[in-house]
UniProtKB/Swiss-Prot annotation:
Ranges for region Disordered: 88-114
Organism: Macaca fascicularis (Crab-eating macaque)
Classification of source organism: Eukaryota, Metazoa, Chordata, Craniata, Vertebrata
Protein's UniProt name: Transcription elongation factor A N-terminal and central domain-containing protein
Domain TFIIS central: 172-288
InterPro entries: TF_IIS-typ, TFIIS/LEDGF_dom_sf, TFIIS_cen_dom, TFIIS_cen_dom_sf, TFIIS_N
Originating gene: TCEANC
């Protein structure tokens, strides 16, 4: 197996172990990468830089982090050495700004020695810059969203591009921001307010992700709920409250489904709740003894049905609990003519 295939295989295995959070076996792969001769072409044609950078950011072991930092420092020296030799050939290497040419010139071998021996030789900005330089441009383009509704139209920052390369959640969060932006602008697409809606969409998504960062399933469910409520024409009060400042993006992100409902739906739910409580007060099975000794208090006819109910089987309101607590039975009456139903608490038998 060639060195390139070995490096690609090691990078793939490291990615799998990181996704399974199996950090115990990472040391063997990092040690193997230290023994393989790595060239600039290997770094650009494989995902080994991204894999080792994820170890540096996500692994809890300090020893493995130092080993990953040493590898990145060593590869940075290799890349700079190759780049300095071919500096007069601009076609081979894309220009990434003045960052590569800035700074005093120095011996690459010294960088390699310092990077391997010192665990603090590579800062987070240097690691990010290294990953940006080595990862090919076509891979970064594949991970970008198809439509860019956000941003000022200029080149993206190094940190943002690197986070998209290393974190698979970033494209999903970008898509959620786009969905929130489309839902916020569904009622009115005024161009002067476009930037304001973009800021609202970003802030709402950030607060939702903060709430459910440990449970992506709940995060997606919450985003779908927000988008559906914002697109509902009856919930136009949500956009109005955001625009007027009555409700902040954080408050909207923390709102439940019940709180986002419009007034009509809230009243309907309240009526359903009240009717269910009233029905729960009454017995489910209406059986009893036919009698003409009781006069209905509504239609004043003598055609009723009487049954005796145990107190313990019902959730009775306070007005029923006026009799002696020793009386365990309650008399329940229903009129066969008009359907009136009531409790008769003055006596328990006939």
């Amino acid at each position: 197996m060639s060195d390139k295939n070995q490096i690609a295989a090691r990078a793939s295995l490291i990615e799998q172990l990181l996704s399974k959070r199996n950090f115990e076996d990472l040391g063997n792969h990092l040690t193997e990468l230290e023994t393989i001769y790595v060239t600039k072409e290997h770094l650009q044609e494989t995902d080994v830089v991204r894999a080792v950078y994820r170890v540096l950011k996500n692994c809890p072991s300090v020893a493995l982090k130092n080993k990953a930092k040493c590898l990145l420092s060593k590869w940075k020296a290799v890349y700079k050495e190759t780049h300095s030799k071919a500096r007069n050939s601009p076609k081979l290497f894309p220009v990434r700004g003045n960052e590569e040419n800035s700074g005093p010139s120095h011996d690459p071998s010294q960088d390699e020695t310092l990077g391997i021996c010192s665990s603090n030789s590579l800062s987070s900005q240097d690691v990010a810059k290294l990953s940006e330089m080595i990862v090919p441009e076509n891979r970064a383009i594949q991970l970008k969203p198809k439509k860019e509704h956000f941003g000022d139209g200029g080149p993206e920052s190094t940190g943002k591009r690197l986070s998209e390369l290393l974190d698979p959640i970033t494209p999903m969060r970008t898509k959620c921001i786009e969905l929130l932006y489309a839902a916020l602008t569904s009622s009115s697409a005024d161009q002067p307010k476009a930037d304001l809606w973009q800021n609202f969409a970003r802030e709402i998504e950030e607060h939702v992700f903060t709430l459910y960062s440990k449970n992506i399933k709940k995060y997606k469910t919450c985003i779908r709920s927000k988008v559906a409520n914002l697109k509902n024409p009856k919930n136009s009060h949500l956009q109005q409250n955001l625009l007027s400042g009555t409700m902040s993006p954080r408050e909207f992100a923390e709102m439940t489904v019940m709180e986002m409902a419009n007034k009509e739906l809230k009243q309907l739910r309240a009526s359903y709740t009240e009717s269910c409580i009233q029905e729960h007060y009454l017995p489910q099975v209406i059986d009893g003894t036919q009698t003409n000794k009781i006069k209905c208090r509504r239609c004043e006819k003598y055609n009723c049905k009487v049954t005796v109910i145990d107190r313990g089987t019902l959730f009775l309101p306070s007005w029923v609990r006026n009799s002696n607590p020793d009386e365990q039975m309650m008399t329940y009456v229903i009129c066969n003519e008009c359907g009136e139903q009531w409790y008769h608490s003055k006596w328990v038998c006939f």
